[in-house]
Amino acid sequence: MIVRDEERNLHPCLDEIAHLFDDIVIVDTGSLDDTTRVIREICKTEALSFPIEEKNWFNKYEARNFGFARLNADWILSLDADERIDPAQILNVRSVLGDGEADGFFTRWTTYQDGREIADYKLSVFRKDFRSSGLVHENVQQDMRLRGGRAVWTDLIHLRHFPDPGKTAFKRDFYKQRLRRAIQVEPSWYRYHWFLGYALFREGNPEAAEHWLQATASARSRQFPVECLNAHLVLAAIHASHGRQEIVARTLNSALSLLSEVGDDFEVRINFGLRPWIEHASQACSRGHLEEIAAYEFCA
């Protein structure tokens, strides 16, 4: 777990589950509140210090890897302080590890925000060998792909995510600023383009979003196949809202073509809604019912 000023979240996150783990590693990146004291109280251990200045927030993946390397266990359950997992499901974590073929497990990940429930997934359980990467929205998927690993789906684990409801306009702007800077540093890491485009789309700025979504979709990246497919979905919805039937059809045909190319990717396989959405949207487009084409919600 990576923390910074999380004293309010730690008790609801860890009180009922801390004693169920073989080892707990929590990395503090520079808390100014009582976070480290609360960790000591709950976990009977000290947080590891890995200070990150606000201006250098791209180092978060390094903080995760710092923690991974110090864990005395073969498998990692990666949690954030604003996530919750029921104690009984910790036992489920142990049970899924019996699948000797898998290197990781995607789990249900539901975000509760502004009175809405957003269903998504997270690669939350994985072998200790893998490393986190990415300047924003870091994860281990890229390392697992590059090393020929394989992650599968499990229904036995459900993480519930309760993000800070006070996400101000300043924080939203800073988030987009970080994504723009990340694109400059790693221009072929199309995960950043996708998240920037989707952030602009959610804010009601589809014209600005279209540029970044098109860059993602056109990349057809095998390193970021889900992001490229997601970009197709949102682009199709944008074009449908403007009545651009021909462009919608081309976008959906491109999505189906890409899906056939990357369908064997372990993350594409667990995106169970992708193909049904594309096929439904294609049928709606062919009938001229563009009003039926709306992107489903992603967590960002």
Regions found by a protein language model. Name each.
Residues 76:
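Short aromatic/hydrophobic "clamp" motif used to bind/position activated sugar donors
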Residues 11, 33-42, 88:
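Acidic helix N-cap motif at the loop->helix transition within catalytic regions
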Residues 16, 20, 28-39, 57, ...:
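A conserved acidic beta->alpha catalytic loop
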Residues 2-20:
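Short, well-formed alpha-helical segments that are part of the catalytic scaffolds
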Residues 182-185, 218-228, 260-271:
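Flexible helix-coil transition and linker loops at the boundaries of alpha-helical arrays
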Residues 60-68, 79, 85-207, 220:
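Catalytic-site signature of metal-activated, phosphate-bearing donor transferases
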